[in-house]
Curated annotation (Swiss-Prot):
Function description: Component of the SRB8-11 complex. The SRB8-11 complex is a regulatory module of the Mediator complex which is itself involved in regulation of basal and activated RNA polymerase II-dependent transcription. The SRB8-11 complex may be involved in the transcriptional repression of a subset of genes regulated by Mediator. It may inhibit the association of the Mediator complex with RNA polymerase II to form the holoenzyme complex.
Residues passing through the membrane, by range: none
Protein name per its UniProtKB record: Mediator of RNA polymerase II transcription subunit 13
Subunit structure: Component of the SRB8-11 complex, which itself associates with the Mediator complex.
Length: 1387
C-alpha cells in the first residue's frame, strides 16, 4: 500500500450525497421586529408571506421575522392594510452576508437563513408529493401509501466558502409508524407532526382518545395548509385525538430516556388530527418472528408433513358413516367429499375444541393448551401469535361462508414444533358456521381478558369488535381464568364444557352420532342465506345463547368427519327465566348486543323517568363544557445547541400578558430543585390591536403566486381575531361581488386517489432514487400552485363559536405545537420499555464504576444487545422524481457534487506498531497482530499480573469447572501472569462455588467465607486480587446490573473487613461456558481483557511505539513563526446524553500508556454538571503533570455538537491553566454527509475481489511482492476543501474539517466508512497541520481497540477512547437513577 496516495485515488470517483443549489455571491436579509412585545404580529406576517408565495424565504427567530433573498432576487414585501389605509412595515435591520462569514461561531442571519431555506424546501416538497412527505421537526417523514412504515428524509443545507449553496439529502429509519388502533401497543412513544413534539395518549384504548373536532378546527387546518403545505381541509371523516404534550420537550429539552414511557404528570392537553400522529415502538418489545410476508422454509415444510400425516391418520381411523351415503362409489370416500369411511378412535379425544379457527385453518392444541408452541418448553418451538401466518389463504369468494372443516393432528408422540394447523380442501362446504363463530369468540375474548382485567363490559365490547375486524389470535390462558371467562360469556353450559374438557379425556366415551347432535348447526343454516361471511362479525348478535330456541324440523345432515365431542355441545339446562316477567321484546337484528351477559339488557325509559337517568346519570358530563386552556412552562435556556432550538420562537411568544410575561421565564428543567412556573393563561390578542391583513395582490409575474393568492378570497366571515385576519380579510361588498366562485373538491379527491394508488419503494441498502423508486413523479398532477389555488372552504363547515375568547384561547393553545419545530437530534433513536435501575446512595459511584468497566473492557460483550443508534444513509441518486422536479423549480442549478469538488487531500495513514515481549525481548509488531497472539507466543511488555479466580454459579456446574480450568491455563500459557483457582473449603471444587440461589443471606454467608480465606492468605503472601466470575443467562443490560448488585453485596462486606484487599468482577456469558466449540481465540481475548482490568488498570497489555522523526527541524529566530510546537498531546473524549442525565469521559495519552474511563450521573442538574466538569479537568491536569513541554489537550466532543453551556465551562477552566492548550474537536460517525466509493482500482486490494466478469489485473505472481494486511485496519485521512457545519448544531461551523475513512472492500460495497472530525479552534497553530496531526493520532489510538478489548472489526478505525465513550452511553442512557438516599435490598 502506498503511503503517498497521490493520483492513485481518483477523487472524481468518490460520489457524495451533496447537491449544489445555487452559486451565491451574497445573501440579502431584512429583519422585522413587532412594535409591541405582546402580540403575534410576526406569526401572522410569516403566514401572510407564505400564503402569498410558498417559495418565500422567511423564518421566525424569537419574536422577529426574517426575510431573505439570494443574490439579486428581490426581498419579500409585506403589503398590509390598516383601516383601508396602505401601510408597509419598515424593517428594523437591513443587510447582507457573503460566503466568507466568520467561524466557528456562525452569524445569526446565516443560521436563520438555513432554517428558512430548509423550511421552504419542506413546504414545497409536501405540496408536490401528494402528501406522502410530511414535515416532522427539522426533517420530514416519507410515508409509504400501502404500508404503515415510514422513513425520515432530511435535508441539511450549507453554504461553502467558494459560494456553493449545497444541501445534503439523507434518510434515517427511526421506526416511526402512523397512529393505528390495530397496531397500538403500550410500549410506544407518540409524536406530533409537523412539530415533532413528544406527546402521550390519555388512554391505551385509542377509541377513548377520539374526540370531536375543536372549535377552531377549520382555522387550524388552514394554518396547517399554508404554514406546512399539509392539506386536510377537505378530508372526509378526519379523526381528532386528545393528547397530553410534554412541556419539557416543547421547551427544547429531551424527556428522560430511561423514563420515556412514564405516565405524563401534566393535565394540559391538545387536540390533534390522528393522521398527523406517529408512534415509535420500544426496542425491547417482542415481535412475532414470522409474518404473512416472511415465512420460514422449515415452517412451511413442517406444515406440509403435518397435513399429510393428519390426512393419512384420518383415513385410517374414521368412525362412522353418514346415513344415506356410501363409501364404495369408485373412491375411498364415496360421493361425499366430507367422509373418509374410517373409524374414529380415542386418540381424537386429546384435541382441544376451543382452538382458534380463522383464515381457513385451525390450531391443534393439546389438553389445556399444553401442546401449544407458546407454552412449550422446546426451544425450537416458535409461537405463532399472528394468524396471518396461515398455511393457505383461500379466497372467501369461493365459498358461501368462511366456516371450515377441522382435521386434528393425530401424532401425539412427537412434540409439535409449530401450530398444528390443517387447512380444508378447497371443495369443502362448511357445515357448522355457528360453532366456528363461538370458538372464535372464545379465543378472541381471551385476548381481551389477558390484556386488562379491570376493563368494564362496555370496554370489552369495543375491544371485541376490534378483534373481530382482524384475525383473532390463539392464546391459551390459565385454567381458572378460562373457566371463569367462559362462564361469563356463554353461561353455565360453558362451565360444564370446560369441566368436561379438563378431566381425563381418555375416560370420555364417544357417543353415537344422531340427528340431534346437529340441532344447533341446523339453526345456523337459516342465517347462512342472509349472511355472506360468518367471520366478519359485523353484528355481535350472532353470538347468542345456543339453547334458547325450540328445536326445529330435523332433516338428514351431511356427515362430518369430526369427532362428536369436538363439534357438538352437550345438552344443558336453559338459562334462568323469571315466570313472572313479561315476555321479552325481540331486539332487531341490526342492533348490537352484549356478549358478556347471558341476558339482554334493553331498558326503555318512559317520559316520566327520573331526570338523572334521562340526562345520562349523576356522573354525566355536559359536552358543551369548555376545558381550561393549556399552560406552558417557559424556559430561559439560551444555551441549547441542537439545530433549531435557538432559532425557533419559544412558547413565551404566544403569551400575551405584556410585561408580566417575563415572570414565567424562571423555569429551567436542568435544576431539579426549581419547580416549573407556568403562565396562568394566554390571553387572546385584542381584535383592534393589530392591522387586519388583507388578501395580497393577485397580480404577479409568477402564475403560482397568483393562483396561491385566491385562497384568501374564499373566507368572507367577519374577523374574530388577528389570526383570522390572515384567512378572512375585510373586503367591501363590491370587492366580494367581483370574486370568482371557485370549487375544486373533485381536484382534491383526484389528488388523494392518485397518492393512494401510487405504490412506491423506499431506499435499498444503497439508496438510489431513480425512475422506479419512491420519488418517481410519473403520476400526472397539477402543480403546487394550482393545487393551492383550488382550495375552497365551505363556510357551512365552520363551527359557530360561542365567544371570541374561547376560540382565541384554543388558537393560543395549539399554535406552539403547530409552528415549533423540534430538531431530530432531540429524539432518541431507541428506548426501552423495561429499564433497569441503579440504587442511589453512597454505594452508587462504586456500582457505576463496575458497570462502566464491564461495558468497556469486556470484549464488546453487549454489542448485540446494546441499543444502537440509527444511521443516516445518503441518497446517492436523485436525478429523477419528485425531489428533482421540486428542487429544479425552486433553484436554478440542482446538480450532484463529486469528491474532487469538496475534498482537498486524501492521504494514507499507516498501521501503528505496538510494544510486546517475545521470550525476554521487547519487540515491535503491527497492531493487527493482536488476532494472532496465540500463535506468536507474545506476552505483555509491562510485566505480569497475578490473580485468584472464583466462579459463582447456580447452574451448569460441570461447564463452569471446565471454563475456569481452560481460562486459567490460557492465562498462564500466554505469560500474562499466574491464575490461582481459589478453594475456600476442602469440600469445594477448585475455582468454583455452587450456590442454591443468590439471595442476600446466601451472599452474606459466602462473603464471610471469602473474608476468612483472604485473611489467612494475606498474612502469608503479597496482596493478590480476587476475581469473581458470574455467568449471566442473557446478554442484557438488566441482567448485567442485576448480577453487579449481587456482587456488590459481597464486595461491600469484603471491603468492610479487608479495606486494602482487592476483589473484582468479570461477567461471562453462559453460552460462552456451555459451548464446547468455543475457540481458543475467544479465551485469549478474555484473558487479555482480564489483564487490562486488573490493578493497576492504567497498565494495559501493550502500548504504542514511538515513531522516529523522518527529519529534524531547527527553529531559529529567522524562521520563527507564531505557531506553537506541541511536545505532547492528551486526548479527552466525552459525551453527554441528549436528555442531559449522564456524562461519560475517557482519557488517553498518545501512546495509550495512560488510560482511564469514568461515568457520572448528572441528573439534568446545572450545579451537578459544573461539579462534573471540575472533576474532569482535575483528572486531566493530573495526566498533564506527567508530561513535559507544551501540552495540547485534544478535547473531543462526540455527536457533532458542542452546546454553549459546555463550552462556557471549558473556557473557564482552560483560562486558569497556562501550560495546557485546549484544542476543541467535534467528531461523529453518524453525520449527514455520505461518501460512496466508485473507484474500481483503489485501494489495490479491490483487485482480489474481482468477479469472473471483471477479472483480476495488476497482481504480481510472486508471493514475495505481496503483503498480508487486515482490510479493516486500512485507514486513510481526508481533508475537505471547505469547513463543514456541525451535523447537529445550526449555529456552529468548523474552521477546518477532515475525516478518517475506510474504503469499501470491493466494488459492490459502495458506502465508505467515515469518522468525521471538525476542528473548532486552533490555539497558536496552523489549522491544517494541527488537524493532520490529530487525524494521525486518532488512527494510532484506533489500533489499540482489539488490544484493550474495546472493539473488534466494525469500529477499528475509530480511536479506542471514542468507541469506549460511545459504548457506555448507548447502554447507560437506559438506566434509571436518582440522587435520593435509599436502602437497596437484593431479592
Amino acid at each position: 500500500m502506498k503511503k503517498e496516495v497521490g493520483d492513485a485515488c481518483r477523487l472524481e470517483d468518490i460520489v457524495t450525497n451533496l447537491y449544489r443549489l445555487e452559486t451565491v455571491k451574497q445573501i440579502n436579509y431584512h429583519q422585522y421586529v413587532p412594535s409591541k412585545a405582546d402580540n403575534q404580529w410576526s406569526i401572522q406576517a410569516e403566514l401572510f408571506l407564505r400564503r402569498k408565495n410558498p417559495k418565500v424565504l422567511a423564518a421566525l427567530f424569537s419574536r422577529e421575522l426574517w426575510c431573505f433573498s439570494i443574490n439579486d432576487d428581490p426581498l419579500p414585501e409585506l403589503n398590509l392594510e390598516l383601516n383601508n389605509e396602505s401601510e408597509s412595515p419598515q424593517p428594523e435591520r437591513k443587510g447582507h452576508f457573503t460566503p466568507e462569514f466568520s467561524k466557528p461561531h456562525l452569524p445569526t442571519p446565516y443560521a436563520i437563513f438555513m432554517k428558512a431555506l430548509r423550511r421552504m424546501i419542506y413546504v414545497n416538497l409536501t405540496l408536490s408529493s401528494n402528501e406522502t412527505i410530511v414535515p416532522f421537526g427539522n426533517s420530514c417523514i416519507f410515508q409509504e401509501s400501502y404500508t404503515f412504515s415510514t422513513k425520515i428524509l432530511h435535508f441539511d443545507p450549507h453554504l461553502f466558502e467558494n459560494g456553493d449553496l449545497t444541501v445534503a439529502i439523507c434518510s434515517k429509519d427511526l421506526g416511526l409508524s402512523k397512529l393505528n388502533a390495530e397496531s397500538l401497543k403500550h410500549e410506544v412513544a407518540v409524536y406530533l407532526a409537523p412539530s415533532g413534539i413528544r406527546v402521550y395518549l390519555p388512554s391505551t384504548d385509542l377509541k377513548k382518545c377520539y374526540v370531536s373536532p375543536p372549535k377552531n378546527a377549520q382555522m387550524f387546518l388552514k394554518t396547517l395548509f399554508v404554514s406546512h403545505g399539509i392539506n386536510l381541509i377537505d378530508v372526509d371523516g378526519l379523526k381528532w385525538v386528545k393528547l397530553i404534550p410534554n412541556a419539557n420537550h416543547l421547551n427544547g429539552f429531551t424527556p428522560t430516556i430511561s423514563h420515556y414511557l412514564d405516565e405524563p404528570k401534566g393535565n394540559n392537553f391538545v387536540i390533534w388530527p390522528a393522521c398527523l400522529c406517529f408512534v415509535q415502538t420500544a426496542s425491547d418489545v417482542q415481535t412475532p418472528q414470522y409474518t404473512a410476508f416472511s415465512r420460514s422454509p422449515q415452517l412451511e415444510l413442517d406444515d406440509c408433513f403435518d397435513m399429510i400425516d393428519g390426512f393419512i391418520q384420518l383415513k385410517l381411523t374414521s368412525a362412522y358413516r353418514t346415513p344415506g351415503t356410501s363409501a364404495g362409489m369408485g373412491t375411498v370416500t364415496g360421493h361425499n367429499p366430507l367422509s373418509t369411511g374410517g373409524i374414529f378412535t380415542d386418540q381424537f379425544q386429546g384435541f382441544n375444541k376451543h382452538s382458534a379457527n380463522n383464515s381457513n385453518n385451525v390450531s391443534s392444541t393439546g389438553e389445556n393448551g399444553k401442546f401449544s408452541p407458546e407454552y412449550s418448553n422446546d426451544p425450537n418451538v416458535t409461537p405463532l401469535r399472528d394468524n396471518k401466518t396461515s398455511r393457505q389463504n383461500f379466497p372467501t369468494e369461493s365459498y358461501s361462508s368462511n366456516g371450515f372443516i377441522t382435521t386434528p393432528i393425530i401424532n401425539e408422540n412427537i412434540t409439535p414444533t409449530v401450530d398444528d394447523i390443517i387447512t380444508e380442501t378447497p371443495s369443502v362446504k362448511p357445515q357448522n358456521d355457528l360453532w366456528n363463530e363461538k370458538k372464535d369468540v372464545i379465543n378472541s375474548t381471551s385476548n381481551i381478558n389477558s390484556k386488562d382485567a379491570s376493563v368494564g363490559s362496555s370496554e370489552r365490547k369495543v375491544e371485541l369488535e376490534t378483534a373481530f375486524e382482524s384475525p383473532a389470535q390463539n392464546i391459551s390462558i390459565e385454567e381458572h381464568e378460562h373457566v371463569e371467562f367462559d362462564k361469563d360469556l356463554f353461561g353455565e353450559d360453558s362451565d360444564e364444557d370446560v369441566s368436561t374438557r379438563n378431566k381425563n379425556e381418555e375416560l370420555v366415551s364417544v357417543k353415537e352420532i344422531t340427528d340431534e347432535m346437529f340441532d344447533l348447526a341446523e339453526d345456523d343454516d337459516e342465517a347462512d342465506g342472509s349472511t355472506s361471511n360468518s367471520l366478519k362479525f359485523d353484528r355481535p348478535d350472532t353470538i347468542e345463547s345456543i339453547d334458547t330456541d325450540e328445536k326445529k324440523t330435523r332433516t338428514k345432515r351431511t356427515y362430518l368427519d369430526i369427532p362428536v365431542d369436538v363439534i357438538t355441545i352437550e345438552k344443558t339446562p336453559t338459562l334462568y327465566e323469571d315466570p313472572g316477567a313479561p315476555l321479552p321484546i325481540e331486539t332487531p337484528k341490526d342492533r348490537k348486543k352484549s356478549i358478556f351477559a347471558p341476558l339482554n339488557f334493553n331498558p326503555i325509559f318512559e317520559s316520566n323517568v327520573d331526570n338523572k337517568y334521562k340526562n345520562g346519570g349523576k356522573f354525566s358530563v355536559n359536552s358543551n363544557t369548555n376545558d381550561e386552556p393549556i399552560q406552558f412552562g417557559i424556559s430561559t435556556s439560551n444555551i441549547s445547541s441542537s439545530e433549531d432550538d435557538d432559532s425557533d420562537f419559544s412558547p413565551a411568544d404566544f403569551n400575551n400578558n405584556g410585561p408580566s410575561a417575563g415572570k414565567g421565564l424562571s423555569y429551567d428543567p436542568r435544576d431539579n430543585d426549581i419547580p416549573m412556573i407556568e403562565s396562568s393563561t394566554y390571553e387572546p390578542i385584542a381584535k383592534d390591536s393589530l392591522p387586519e391583513l388583507i388578501n395580497p395582490p393577485s397580480s404577479s409575474k409568477d402564475d403560482s403566486v397568483a393562483s396561491y393568492n385566491t385562497i384568501g378570497t374564499l373566507m368572507e366571515k367577519p374577523v374574530k381575531s388577528n389570526l383570522d385576519a390572515i384567512w378572512k380579510p375585510a373586503l367591501s361588498k363590491s370587492e366580494r361581488a367581483d370574486l370568482p366562485n371557485q370549487t375544486i373538491n373533485g381536484v382534491i379527491n383526484d389528488c388523494n386517489n392518485s397518492s393512494n394508488s401510487n405504490p412506491t419503494t423506499y431506499f435499498e441498502n444503497t439508496p438510489s432514487l431513480g425512475p422506479d423508486t419512491l420519488y418517481d413523479n410519473s403520476k400526472p398532477r397539477s402543480s403546487s400552485a394550482n393545487f393551492l389555488s383550488t382550495v375552497e372552504i365551505d363556510p357551512k363547515s365552520e363551527q359557530t363559536i360561542q365567544t371570541a375568547e374561547q376560540e382565541q384561547s384554543e388558537s393560543s393553545r395549539i399554535l406552539p405545537y403547530l409552528l415549533r419545530h423540534m430538531p431530530l437530534f432531540s429524539l432518541p433513536d431507541v428506548f426501552l420499555c423495561q429499564n433497569p435501575s441503579l440504587p442511589p446512595g453512597k454505594d452508587f459511584e462504586d456500582i457505576l464504576e463496575i458497570l462502566t468497566d464491564q461495558i468497556v473492557f469486556n470484549n464488546d460483550m453487549f454489542s448485540d444487545d446494546r441499543a444502537t443508534e440509527s444511521q443516516f444513509k445518503g441518497i446517492k441518486d436523485c436525478s429523477v422524481g419528485t425531489i428533482s422536479d421540486t428542487m429544479n423549480q425552486l433553484f436554478g442549478n440542482f446538480s450532484k457534487l463529486h469528491g474532487n469538488e469538496i475534498i482537498e487531500e486524501v492521504f494514507y495513514l499507516p498501521e501503528p506498531s505496538v510494544f510486546v515481549k517475545k521470550s525476554e525481548d521487547t519487540i515491535k509488531i503491527k497492531s493487527s497482530s493482536c488476532y494472532f497472539t496465540e500463535y506468536l507466543n507474545l506476552k505483555p511488555n509491562r510485566g505480569v499480573k497475578n490473580f485468584r479466580a472464583l466462579v459463582l454459579t447456580t447452574e451448569a456446574k460441570n461447564d463452569c469447572m471446565s471454563f475456569v480450568s481452560q481460562m486459567s491455563q490460557t492465562y498462564s500459557n500466554h505469560e500474562l501472569g499466574f491464575c490461582e483457582l481459589t478453594k475456600l473449603t476442602n469440600d469445594d471444587n477448585k475455582g468454583l462455588i455452587y450456590l442454591k440461589n443468590f439471595n442476600q443471606d446466601t451472599l452474606l454467608l459466602l462473603s464471610a467465607q471469602i473474608v476468612s480465606f483472604c485473611s489467612t492468605a494475606l498474612s502469608n503472601i503479597k496482596n493478590i486480587p480476587l476475581l469473581i466470575f458470574l455467568p449471566i443467562n442473557k446478554l442484557s443490560l438488566t441482567e448485567c446490573i442485576s448480577m453487579i448488585l449481587k456482587f456488590h453485596v459481597i464486595r461491600k462486606e469484603f471491603k468492610s473487613k479487608l479495606p486494602k484487599a482487592d476483589i473484582l468482577l468479570r461477567l461471562v456469558n453462559i453460552d460462552f461456558l456451555k459451548n464446547p466449540l468455543t475457540p481458543i481465540t475467544a479465551y485469549t481475548s478474555l484473558c487479555m481483557a482480564i489483564y487490562n482490568s486488573l490493578p493497576p488498570k492504567s497498565t494495559k497489555v501493550t502500548s504504542l511505539t514511538n515513531d522516529l522523526p523522518k527529519q529534524i527541524e531547527f527553529r531559529t529566530l529567522k524562521n520563527a513563526s507564531l505557531s506553537i510546537h506541541y511536545d505532547n498531546y492528551i486526548h479527552l473524549a466525552y459525551l453527554r446524553s441528549i436528555d442531559r442525565e449522564w456524562l461519560c469521559a475517557a482519557w488517553s495519552d498518545t501512546k495509550g500508556v495512560e488510560s482511564f474511563v469514568k461515568t457520572w450521573y448528572v441528573g439534568n442538574s446545572r450545579t451537578r454538571f459544573e461539579q462534573v466538569c471540575n472533576d474532569i479537568w482535575k483528572i486531566t491536569l493530573q495526566l498533564a503533570s506527567k508530561n513535559f513541554g507544551n501540552v495540547c489537550l485534544v478535547l473531543t466532543r462526540l455527536d457533532s455538537v458542542l452546546p454553549d453551556d459546555e463550552l462556557i465551562h471549558w473556557r473557564r477552566l482552560s483560562v486558569a491553566t497556562k501550560d495546557l492548550h485546549l484544542a476543541v474537536v467535534c467528531v461523529g460517525d453518524n453525520t449527514k454527509l455520505t461518501l460512496f466509493d466508485e473507484d474500481k482500482t483503489y485501494p489495490t486490494f479491490k483487485n482480489l475481489f474481482r468477479t469472473k466478469s471483471n477479472p483480476q489485473t495488476g497482481i504480481s505472481n510472486s508471493i514475495d511482492d505481496l503483503e498480508i494486511i487486515n482490510i479493516d485496519e486500512e485507514v486513510h485521512g481526508l481533508i475537505f476543501s471547505n469547513p463543514l457545519q456541525l451535523a447537529n448544531s445550526q449555529h456552529r461551523c468548523a474552521i477546518k474539517s477532515g475525516a478518517l475513512i475506510r474504503f469499501a472492500k470491493s466494488e459492490g460495497d459502495n458506502f465508505i466508512d467515515k469518522f468525521e472530525v471538525n476542528l473548532l479552534n486552533c490555539p497558536h497553530a496552523d489549522s491544517s497541520t494541527l488537524l493532520k496531526e490529530i487525524l494521525k493520532q486518532y488512527r494510532n489510538l484506533a489500533g489499540l481497540n482489539p488490544w484493550f478489548g474495546v472493539s473488534y472489526g466494525k469500529d477499528n478505525f475509530i480511536p479506542w477512547h471514542v468507541v469506549a465513550v460511545k459504548n457506555v452511553m448507548n447502554s447507560i442512557v437506559h438506566v434509571k437513577s436518582s440522587f435520593e438516599k435509599e436502602t437497596h435490598i437484593i431479592d
